[in-house]
């Protein structure tokens, strides 16, 4: 591989680093390549230069990554008189090891900015990025899983980054349920040219978190945030959230959802959706993304244009016991019992080693369902 191509390949490494992947998953150049002065310079500019690389990961993560990089460079040194460490990298390392380090508990509970980069299909394509505020440790103390972006959300984002996926959103009025960090909604609003996107969640802290992320991503009136406790009517966002969107325009064509459930019993969601105004009148489509283990589910729904937020309320319905005990009944069976038609779409995310953005594990398959009624 030529030096220019090697430098270009560092953009993938920088995207993985900004997403704060585990060190074992970083696509580091080999020792004979990383020792080259131009490669070291590019690594500094893309990953550690505070004036150019924003947002930077937490100090602890940067320190671990840079330590690994320096060790790899040292492995590649064959002529001490010719090969040397980049002075900017050395200075950065010196600064990092002198900074105070929070405890592991503090690190786990602190929110940090994470930058996600969309998959790229050409070398000249400008990167599409979304910045969220997350803590992958807060799920244990907060009682919600919404403080991090999970694999199924990244799978959904990957699907939406394709021409087929983007077509579901372009020009449409979109709402996301259980938005969590807002990753999917913000990506759709920022790059897929929808008419409007509303991200909803039940947790007040997550709502405030998404409002802050809205500003960091430069989003305006095309993106709003609202609260929805399932089992109650969906409240209208405040004027500050909707900005130029009028109340009459707050209806939608597409509903997105990712990682909404954690076990098969939560297929009650079909019953919830089936008893709302969301499912009235003309035929509509739904697409469900489902982990093979049934621990997480995502979906995309297209509904009639006149469905408004005031119609979003539901009555619970009791499940048959077999839904709680027999995984084999799954989406198809439960959809049929709520008068849906579920068809599995032939879409899979690229294997982890072939991904160019929205990096996520693929060991547990996430199946894509198109559900119509």
Regions found by a protein language model. Name each.
Residues 1-373:
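S-adenosylmethionine-dependent methyltransferases
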